[in-house]
A protein has these predicted regions:
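Phosphate-ester processing/binding pockets and catalytic centers
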Residues: 1-136
């Protein structure tokens, strides 16, 4: 029997439309826990260490926006970090799904929540049997 882990993260905010943050996004990453990714994680940590980032937790938003500790890091160095993360993600046996709402077409938080809820519930209904089959 498999165990499916679902990691959920959001990006953006429910606030008014802003060209710097035009979307509200909810992402789900699906990982079958019977597939061990420890070696992949160790490899990523080693690669980050080799470019000067030992024990480094990657948060893409601050890297892209040059925030916090990434403020003084030049474009090429930030790109190297992101490329390591992209390569790591591509090789993993995971799947993901993104749900988003373009905020310029939204009246209020209730509409944002409603549109996202509809997308997520439709996805779950469509994939429900797949989720059950994985658990058998």
């Amino acid at each position: 029997m498999s165990e499916l882990s679902i990691f959920i993260d959001e990006s953006g905010d429910f606030g008014a439309y802003d060209y710097r943050s035009p979307y509200y996004i909810v992402s789900m990453v699906f990982h079958d826990q019977s597939i061990d990714i420890t070696e992949d994680i160790d490899k990523l940590e080693k690669q980050l260490s080799m470019i000067g980032y030992p024990n480094h937790c990657i948060h893409v938003g601050p890297i892209v926006r040059m925030e916090g500790k990434y403020k003084e890091i030049d474009y090429l160095e930030r790109r190297r970090i992101l490329n390591k993360m992209v390569a790591f993600t591509k090789q993993l046996d995971i799947s993901y799904k993104n749900f988003y709402v373009e905020k310029k077409h939204i009246v209020d938080d209730v509409e944002t929540s409603s549109k996202l809820s509809k997308q997520i519930s439709t996805f779950i209904r469509e994939k429900y049997q797949d989720f059950l089959n994985m658990m058998l």
